Amino acid sequence: MTDELSGRRVAILATDGVERVELEQPRGALHGAGARTELLSLHTGEINARQKDIAPAGTFSVDKRVADASVDDYDALLLPGGTVNPDQLRTDPDAVAFVREFMGTGKPVATICRGPWTLAEAGVLRGRRLTSWPGIRTDLRNAGADVVDEEVVVDGQLVSGRGPDDLPAFCAAVVEEVVRALRRS
């Protein structure tokens, strides 16, 4: 455990249907580096997690509705995947606006699996290089992204990972890039 991110806040934007490990493991890595995380969602209370999109996998307590959140309060943003989670986020105007505004700040944004769907909806992928779950790559290319099949891709402020099998490398890259961005600021 280190304290490189002590005092820093990371927003995690997710809703019902989030892939449990894609929220839990990056959050754990950020906590291990000293960061504080807040779970933003479409509603208050709890969100239901899934395992491999099918099996119920417990719940996570929501800290704040995304409609009530400000990008100024956070040093980085994490967009975990699952199928249902980003599918709901990309149809919510508040979630899409939050993601678009966050990308506009230049602060780190990390996304894995199907999480980039929300970035595509926000219109912020044109000319960006990233990776994702294979099933959404055509959507990302249609949004103007250069999509590659790699474990983890870092393109400026954007850190992306393919899926659950790549979580160790993704988590390490997320912490590294947030630390690097904070050193530059």
Residue ranges and their predicted role:
Residues 113:
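Catalytic nucleophile serine of serine hydrolases
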Residues 1-105, 109, 117-129, 137-185:
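Extended, subdomain-level signal for the structured scaffold at the beginning of enzyme domains
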